[in-house]
Design a protein with these regions (language model features):
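Sec-dependent N-terminal signal peptides
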Residues: 4-14
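Alpha-helical interaction segments
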Residues: 9, 63, 143-144
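Sec/Tat signal peptide C-region and signal peptidase I cleavage site
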Residues: 16-20
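Acidic, serine/threonine-rich low-complexity disordered tracts
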Residues: 21-114, 158-251
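Active-site/ligand-binding surface loops and adjacent short beta/alpha elements
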Residues: 117-175
Length: 251
């Protein structure tokens, strides 16, 4: 359950049409499924929304585990973010999370230099079982395209998949309240997927997260994004130690 909520966040992640100054508001809902052998059960749900606030975009993702899953690992995550309309560049990112016995609050404020540099002023506050475990301000630096865990979802949907060949890779820097990582998108071609009662033609994309020295920081995840003008991620999938988790759009 935790991994798929993080997968939704890490896509990573909605934009209808190609983004521009007149991007309409939208709300997209997902169910989080746990699959292991014959077990196929809904473990949670998530809602991600976008609003045009005039000078910028505001987005929010809310993810919850289902009551039966709460017995094993409770997830109550809320992500908030604001983005410049020009290039979907993030301005502010915030994650409020209750995961198991921990409560976390991460923030990132983005500053852009004239030379293409990006500075992230980050804070991370962690409380476990009522005890303060971390209160860590830090500053992260990057060059070129840089996103957070929420704006990456929109960035992905605006990539020119229709111009890519199978096997093409493109990377972007991603800041969280904890660290800097590289998020690499690998294009796997066009596939058809069945979600609920609908069949979609999709771009299949694999996501890879790496840290310093190219070391993997989490397992790969896969997403299927419609080839139409909406570019909707209709299915996301990640592996667990036992079974796998799948996020499906509610249509």
């Amino acid at each position: 359950m935790k991994k798929l909520i993080l997968a939704i966040i890490g896509l990573v992640v909605p934009a209808a049409l190609c983004f521009g100054s007149s991007q309409p508001s939208e709300t997209v809902r997902y169910r989080v499924m746990y699959k292991w052998g014959l077990i196929n059960k809904q473990a949670g749900h998530a809602v991600i929304s976008l609003r045009d606030d005039g000078s910028h975009y505001t987005s929010q993702l809310v993810g919850h585990s289902e009551p039966w899953a709460d017995k094993f690992f409770t997830v109550r995550d809320t992500l908030n973010g604001t983005m410049h309309k020009d290039g979907l560049r993030p301005i502010f990112y915030e994650k409020k999370a209750h995961e198991g016995s921990e409560d976390k609050h991460d923030t990132v404020r983005f500053i852009y230099g004239d030379n293409g540099s990006v500075t992230g002023h980050c804070t991370r506050h962690v409380v476990k079982k009522g005890e303060l475990k971390a209160n860590q301000p830090q500053t992260l630096y990057a060059e070129g395209p840089t996103v957070d865990m929420l704006s990456s979802y929109y960035y992905m949907r605006n990539l020119p998949f229709n111009k890519w060949q199978k096997g093409h890779k493109e990377s972007v820097t991603i800041f969280s309240g904890k660290r800097k990582e590289t998020l690499t998108f690998e294009y796997n071609g066009i596939e058809f997927v069945q979600v609920g009662k609908k069949r979609y033609q999709c771009y299949h994309v694999t996501f890879k997260f790496t840290g310093d020295g190219g070391k993997k920081t989490s397992d790969n995840m896969d997403a299927w994004i419609t080839t139409d003008s909406r570019r909707l991620p209709v299915q996301l999938e990640g592996k667990l130690v036992v079974g796998k988790v799948k996020c499906e759009i509610i249509n």
